[in-house]
């Protein structure tokens, strides 16, 4: 079955019916933002879109999160919400937004770390955990996922 945890990574937002339960079973099809859009990394954008639409000459983004301006851990959390392997939810689905601390919403599963099959990272593996254990990461205090990956470009099949 497709769970709210699946949707948290494969759609930008989905509203569960029946209130804010930890694991809603039903979702309103008309209240799903399909795909992974800007809001997944930049947070809710209604106020941003309204402002920019009314002020097209303003080139500085307002009312939207710039992940590059977040702390290192908050930047990592933006990616880890979908790339940290199994996590136990402690708050309802779709409550985490960029700039918040992931540990307030999920408990990372340190027991089931990502397995390497033939040298490849499993799709639902713990890329976050692998990064944190890498020599590159531990040698610096500034490395984040975006040090090697550009989320604004399709980089499928490319080595980091």
Regions found by a protein language model. Give the residues of each.
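Parallel beta-helix/beta-solenoid
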Residues: 2-13
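Primarily the internal scaffold of c-type cytochrome electron-transfer domains
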Residues: 1, 15-160
């Amino acid at each position: 079955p497709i769970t709210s945890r699946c949707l948290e990574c494969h759609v930008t937002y989905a509203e569960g019916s029946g209130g804010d339960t930890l694991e809603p079973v039903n979702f309103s099809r008309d209240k799903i933002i399909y795909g992974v859009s800007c809001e997944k990394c930049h947070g809710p954008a209604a106020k941003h879109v309204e402002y920019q639409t009314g002020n097209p000459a303003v080139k500085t983004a307002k009312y939207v999160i710039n992940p590059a301006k977040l702390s290192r851990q908050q930047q990592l959390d933006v990616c880890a919400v979908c790339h940290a392997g199994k996590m136990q939810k402690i708050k309802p689905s779709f409550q985490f937004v960029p700039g918040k601390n992931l540990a307030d919403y999920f408990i990372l599963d340190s027991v089931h770390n990502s397995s390497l099959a033939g040298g490849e990272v499993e799709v639902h593996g713990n890329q976050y955990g692998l990064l944190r254990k890498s020599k590159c990461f531990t040698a610096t205090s500034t490395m984040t996922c975006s040090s090697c990956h550009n989320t604004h470009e399709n980089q499928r099949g490319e080595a980091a």
